[in-house]
C-alpha cells in the first residue's frame, strides 16, 4: 500500500467533502436492519452495502453494535438465544434470512475469521481439508491436496508449514494460527470474508503480516472487518462505517471518513474525544 496516501486518524475537519467516487456493485446489500436481544434493540435501522473486491471496516466504541451487525451477514446471530434480526440482507438479489436458505451453505459463501484464532483440534492439513470434504469440493485426494496447498499459499502460510502438514494446527504460533483460520475459510471458495477483530490477540509483527494478507485477499474477495483500531481501519480498508449506540452514523471512503468526516460524532470519535 502507498503509505504516502494513507489516511490519518488525526486532524479531521468538518468542511463539506466531495461525493464519494463510484464503487463496484454491492456483493451484499443490507436494508433497514434491526437486531433485538429479547426486548432490547441492539441495531437500529441500518442500511449498508459492501462492494466486491474491497475492504470495508466497521469502527466504533465498544458495545456500539459493530460485531452484532457483522454476525448478521452470515446468520451467526441465529445461534444466539432470543436474538432476532429484521430487515433484508440481499446477496445476489436473494434475502439470506429467507427460510429456504441453508445457513451452512451460506457460511461457506460468507466465511468468518474470529477474534481469537480457533484452529480445529486436527492436523494443519485436516484443518484446511475439512470444509472441502464436507461440501464435496474435491473428487480425489489429488484435488484435496491442491485445495490445501492453494489455500495455504493464499494465506501466506504454505512455505512455513509445507513440511509439517500433519502437525497439529494448535502447534503453530498465534499469528500462524490466524492465517490457518483464514486459509480454512478460503478453502470452501467463499465470496465474502468477515473478520471480527482478527488481530486483537496478536503481537505487532503478526498483526502486520495479517494486514498484508488482507490487502492481498481483497483482490479476490469482498472483506468486512470489525476493528477497535482506527489506525488499522485506515491502513487496510477502502470504505469505513462508523457505528455508535447501534446506529450507523456515517459511511464513506476511508480517506474521507478519517480526514473530512461529515458528522460531528464521527469527528469526535476519530479525534479521541470519546471512545
UniProtKB/Swiss-Prot annotation:
UniProt-listed Enzyme Commission number(s): 7.3.2.1
Intracellular or extracellular location(s): Cell inner membrane
Catalytic reaction list: phosphate(out) + ATP + H2O = ADP + 2 phosphate(in) + H(+)
Domain ABC transporter: 28-270
Classification lineage: Bacteria, Pseudomonadati, Pseudomonadota, Alphaproteobacteria, Hyphomonadales
An annotated Gene Ontology molecular function: ATPase-coupled phosphate ion transmembrane transporter activity
First-listed, main subcellular location of the protein, grouped into a coarse class: membrane
Keywords tagged on the record: ATP-binding, Cell inner membrane, Cell membrane, Membrane, Nucleotide-binding, Phosphate transport, Translocase, Transport
Keyword Cell inner membrane belongs to the record: yes
Organism whose genome encodes this protein: Hyphomonas neptunium (strain ATCC 15444)
GO biological process, alphabetically ordered: phosphate ion transmembrane transport
Name by which UniProt lists this protein: Phosphate import ATP-binding protein PstB
InterPro entries registered for this protein in UniProt: AAA+_ATPase, ABC_transporter-like_ATP-bd, ABC_transporter-like_CS, P-loop_NTPase, PstB-like
Residues that bind ATP: 60-67
Membrane disposition: Peripheral membrane protein
Similarity section: Belongs to the ABC transporter superfamily. Phosphate importer (TC 3.A.1.7) family.
Amino acid at each position: 500500500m502507498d503509505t504516502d496516501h494513507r489516511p490519518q486518524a488525526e486532524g479531521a475537519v468538518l468542511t463539506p467533502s466531495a461525493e464519494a467516487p463510484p464503487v463496484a456493485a454491492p456483493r451484499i446489500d443490507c436494508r433497514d436492519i434491526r437486531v433485538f436481544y429479547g426486548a432490547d434493540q441492539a441495531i437500529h435501522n441500518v442500511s449498508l452495502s459492501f462492494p466486491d473486491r474491497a475492504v470495508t471496516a466497521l469502527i466504533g466504541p465498544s458495545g456500539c453494535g459493530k460485531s452484532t451487525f457483522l454476525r448478521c451477514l452470515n446468520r451467526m446471530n441465529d445461534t444466539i438465544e432470543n436474538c432476532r434480526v429484521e430487515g433484508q440482507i440481499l446477496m445476489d438479489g436473494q434475502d439470506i434470512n429467507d427460510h429456504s436458505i441453508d445457513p451452512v451453505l451460506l457460511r461457506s459463501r460468507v466465511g468468518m475469521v474470529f477474534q481469537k484464532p480457533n484452529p480445529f483440534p486436527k492436523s494443519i492439513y485436516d484443518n484446511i481439508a475439512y470444509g472441502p470434504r464436507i461440501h464435496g469440493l474435491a473428487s480425489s485426494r489429488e484435488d484435496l491436496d491442491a485445495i490445501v496447498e492453494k489455500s495455504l499459499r493464499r494465506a501466506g502460510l504454505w512455505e512455513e508449514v509445507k513440511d509439517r502438514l500433519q502437525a497439529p494446527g494448535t502447534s503453530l504460533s498465534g499469528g500462524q494460527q490466524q492465517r490457518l483460520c483464514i486459509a480454512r475459510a478460503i478453502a470452501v471458495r467463499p465470496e465474502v470474508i468477515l473478520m471480527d477483530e482478527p488481530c486483537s490477540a496478536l503481537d505487532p509483527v503478526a498483526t502486520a503480516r495479517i494486514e498484508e494478507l488482507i490487502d492481498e485477499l481483497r483482490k479476490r474477495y469482498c472483506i468486512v472487518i470489525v476493528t477497535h483500531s482506527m489506525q488499522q481501519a485506515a491502513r487496510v480498508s477502502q470504505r469505513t462505517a462508523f457505528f455508535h449506540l447501534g446506529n450507523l452514523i456515517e459511511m464513506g471512503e476511508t480517506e474521507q471518513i478519517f480526514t473530512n468526516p461529515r458528522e460531528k460524532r464521527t469527528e469526535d470519535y476519530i479525534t479521541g474525544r470519546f471512545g
